């Protein structure tokens, strides 16, 4: 059974790129367009790993991560932040919210899959 990954990003292009990279690597992908929808999909789909953007409407990535970590069954699910941001303070804020790792866009599909394999092991 392949790993199920939830991607949360308001950019349709980025969601499409993630879906292509992840399905090509053999993962099942479910998607959400912002943090609010992300929390709904998280509860419904119960993914093995999450990849989220930070800057999104309705509920940003920090709020999404904090919301996910409030639920016992999602406290240990790896959450990777995939964003254009590289500011150390934003990275620290994401870690404090409960993020597992940080990847800067644009991403290399092979490196993304490598990171997923490492954090999901």
In which residue ranges do the predicted regions lie?
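Short, glycine/charged-rich "phosphate-handling" switch motifs in NTP-dependent
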Residues: 100
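C-terminal output helix
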Residues: 107-116
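Active-site residues of response regulator receiver
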Residues: 53, 83
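Receiver (REC) domain active-site loop signature in two-component systems and cognate sites
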Residues: 56
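Active-site beta3 strand of CheY-like receiver
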Residues: 45-51
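Conserved acidic segment of CheY-like receiver
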Residues: 2-13, 18-22, 50
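Short hydrophobic/Thr-rich beta-strand motif most characteristic of the beta2 strand and flanking loop
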Residues: 26-33, 41
């Amino acid at each position: 059974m392949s790993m199920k990954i939830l991607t949360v990003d308001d950019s349709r292009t980025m969601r499409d790129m993630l879906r292509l990279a992840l399905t090509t690597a053999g993962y099942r992908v479910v998607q959400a367009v912002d943090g609010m929808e992300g929390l709904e999909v998280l509860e419904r789909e119960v993914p093995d790993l999450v990849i989220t953007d930070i800057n999104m409407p309705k509920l940003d990535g920090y709020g999404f991560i904090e919301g996910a970590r409030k639920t016992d069954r999602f406290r240990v699910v790896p959450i990777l932040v995939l964003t254009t941001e590289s500011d150390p303070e934003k990275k620290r804020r994401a870690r404090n919210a409960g993020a597992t790792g940080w990847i800067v866009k644009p991403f290399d599909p092979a490196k993304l899959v490598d990171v997923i394999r490492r954090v999901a092991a």
